C-alpha cells in the first residue's frame, strides 16, 4: 500500500488514496445528468452495504456528519416526540445538545466513558418512561473507541415499539450493520470515515415509512431530509449546491472499497491495524484506556505517560515531524491521547507510527510511562 505523508492517524478526516484525491481534479456541473447519475450510483452502493434498498432511503446531505445527525433528529423525531439519548462519551453528549437546541423533549442515560450501555439498561429505561418515542445512541463512541452493543439494544427498542436513531459515523463501512436484522429509523454516517472518502458529505439511511410521514417536522429548510429526498426522487438533483468534488471522491473511494473486498476486507485491515497498534504500544509500556473486549478497531485511546517531561503538544509536534498526525484525548477524568486505525493505511504504516512514537519518547527523555 503506497501512502503519502503525513499519515493521519485520526478518526476522520483521514489518509486517502491517490486515486481518491485524483477524482477531485475534475469539475462537475451540479445539474448535469452525469453528476446526477453519480449521486444515484453512490446512494445505491451505500444502501447495498447495509442491505437496505428495500427498507430504507439513502438521503445525502452537504456538510459534516454532525449536520446529518441534526437533520435526522430534526426530520424524523416529531415535535411532540421524546428522545432517550444514551451517552458514554462526547458524541453522545452532542446528541443530547442537538435535541436541546432543536427543542425536542429528551432524557439522557449516561455511563462511564469505559462502560458500554447495555440492553438491560435500555429495557429498564423504556419500562420506566412510556413517553419516550425514540432512542438515540452512538455505535462507536469516537471519544474513546468504545463499541456499544447495537444489535442487542436495537431488539429491546423494537420490542417496546420505539424508534431507533443510530450515529454510526465511526463504524459504518467497517463494522457490520444489516438493516434486515437490526430495525432502525435512521442510521447516520459520513464520507470521510471508514469509506475513506474526504469530509464534506453526510448521509442518512431513513426508514421509508418514517420518512414518508416526516413532512413538516423539520426545524430547518436546508436540513429537511423529507424535502431533500422528495426533491431528489422527483428531479435526480440536490436541492441546493452539492459538494461535487466530495461526491466524486466518495464514488471513487467506493470503487476501491469493492475492489478491496467490501466490508469484510475493510474490517479485517482495520482490525489488523488496531492489533498491531495495541501490541506495539504495549511493548513501549503505553496502556490502552479500554479493555480489548469493548475496543472497536477504529480509534484507540491511550493513557498519557506519567513522566512530567511528557507534554502532549510537544509530543504531537515531534511525532508530526516524523510524518504522523495523532489526535488529542477527549476524556474528562484522565489525560490521554488517541491514535486512529482507519484510513488508507495498513500494518506497515501502524508499525512505522509506533516506531516514530518510540523515537519521540526517547528524544523527550520520557521514562515513566
From Swiss-Prot:
Disulfide cysteine pairs (residue numbers): none
Keyword vocabulary terms for this entry: Aminotransferase, Pyridoxal phosphate, Pyruvate, Transferase
Catalytic EC class: transferase
Reactions performed catalytically: (2-aminoethyl)phosphonate + pyruvate = phosphonoacetaldehyde + L-alanine
Domain of life from the UniProt record: Bacteria
Keyword Transferase listed: yes
GO MF: 2-aminoethylphosphonate-pyruvate transaminase activity
InterPro entries the UniProt entry points to: Aminotrans_V_dom, NH2EtPonate_pyrv_transaminase, PyrdxlP-dep_Trfase, PyrdxlP-dep_Trfase_major, PyrdxlP-dep_Trfase_small, SP_NH2Trfase/AEP_transaminase
Transit peptide recorded as keyword: no
Entry EC number(s): 2.6.1.37
GO BP of this protein: organic phosphonate catabolic process
Residue numbers carrying N6-(pyridoxal phosphate)lysine: 193
Chain segments annotated as coiled-coil in the UniProt record: none
Gene3D superfamilies: Aspartate Aminotransferase, domain 1 (3.90.1150.10), Type I PLP-dependent aspartate aminotransferase-like (Major domain) (3.40.640.10)
Listed cofactors: pyridoxal 5'-phosphate
Subunit structure and binding partners: Homodimer.
Homology family: Belongs to the class-V pyridoxal-phosphate-dependent aminotransferase family. PhnW subfamily.
PANTHER family listed in its UniProt record: 2-AMINOETHYLPHOSPHONATE--PYRUVATE TRANSAMINASE (PTHR42778:SF1)
Purpose of the protein: Involved in phosphonate degradation.
Name of the protein described by the UniProt record: 2-aminoethylphosphonate--pyruvate transaminase
Gene symbol of the encoding locus: phnW
Amino acid at each position: 500500500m503506497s501512502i503519502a505523508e503525513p499519515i493521519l492517524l485520526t478518526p476522520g478526516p483521514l489518509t486517502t488514496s491517490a486515486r481518491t484525491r485524483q477524482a477531485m481534479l475534475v469539475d462537475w456541473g451540479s445539474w448535469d445528468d452525469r453528476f446526477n447519475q453519480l449521486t444515484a450510483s453512490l446512494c445505491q452502493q451505500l444502501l447495498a452495504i447495509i442491505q437496505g434498498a428495500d427498507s430504507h432511503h439513502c438521503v445525502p446531505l452537504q456538510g459534516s456528519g454532525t449536520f446529518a445527525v441534526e437533520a435526522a433528529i430534526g426530520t424524523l423525531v416529531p415535535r411532540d416526540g421524546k428522545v432517550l439519548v444514551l451517552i458514554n462519551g462526547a458524541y453522545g453528549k452532542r446528541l443530547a445538545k442537538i435535541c436541546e437546541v432543536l427543542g425536542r423533549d429528551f432524557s439522557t442515560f449516561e455511563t462511564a466513558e469505559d462502560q458500554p450501555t447495555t440492553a438491560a439498561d435500555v429495557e429498564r429505561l423504556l419500562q420506566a418512561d412510556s413517553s419516550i418515542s425514540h432512542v438515540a445512541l452512538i455505535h462507536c463512541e469516537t471519544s474513546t473507541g468504545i463499541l456499544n452493543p447495537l444489535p442487542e439494544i436495537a431488539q429491546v427498542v423494537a420490542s417496546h415499539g420505539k424508534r431507533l436513531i443510530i450515529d454510526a459515523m465511526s463504524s459504518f463501512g467497517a463494522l457490520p450493520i444489516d438493516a434486515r436484522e437490526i430495525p432502525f429509523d435512521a442510521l447516520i454516517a459520513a464520507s470521510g470515515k471508514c469509506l475513506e472518502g474526504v469530509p464534506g458529505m453526510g448521509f442518512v439511511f431513513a426508514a421509508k415509512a418514517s420518512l414518508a410521514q416526516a413532512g413538516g417536522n423539520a426545524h430547518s429548510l436546508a436540513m429537511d431530509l423529507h424535502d431533500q429526498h422528495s426533491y431528489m426522487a422527483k428531479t435526480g438533483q440536490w436541492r441546493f449546491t452539492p459538494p461535487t468534488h466530495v461526491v466524486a471522491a466518495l464514488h471513487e473511494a467506493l470503487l476501491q472499497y469493492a475492489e478491496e473486498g467490501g466490508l469484510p476486507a475493510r474490517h479485517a485491515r482495520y482490525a489488523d491495524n488496531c492489533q498491531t497498534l495495541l501490541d506495539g504500544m504495549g511493548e513501549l509500556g503505553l496502556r490502552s484506556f479500554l479493555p480489548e473486549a469493548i475496543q472497536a478497531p477504529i480509534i484507540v485511546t491511550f493513557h498519557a505517560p506519567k513522566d512530567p517531561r511528557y507534554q502532549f503538544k510537544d509530543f504531537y509536534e515531534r511525532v508530526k515531524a516524523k510524518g504522523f498526525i495523532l489526535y488529542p484525548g477527549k476524556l474528562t477524568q484522565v489525560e490521554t491521547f488517541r491514535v486512529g486505525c482507519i484510513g488508507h493505511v495498513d500494518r506497515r504504516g501502524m508499525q512505522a507510527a509506533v516506531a516514530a512514537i518510540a523515537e519521540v519518547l526517547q528524544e523527550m527523555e520520557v521514562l515513566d510511562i
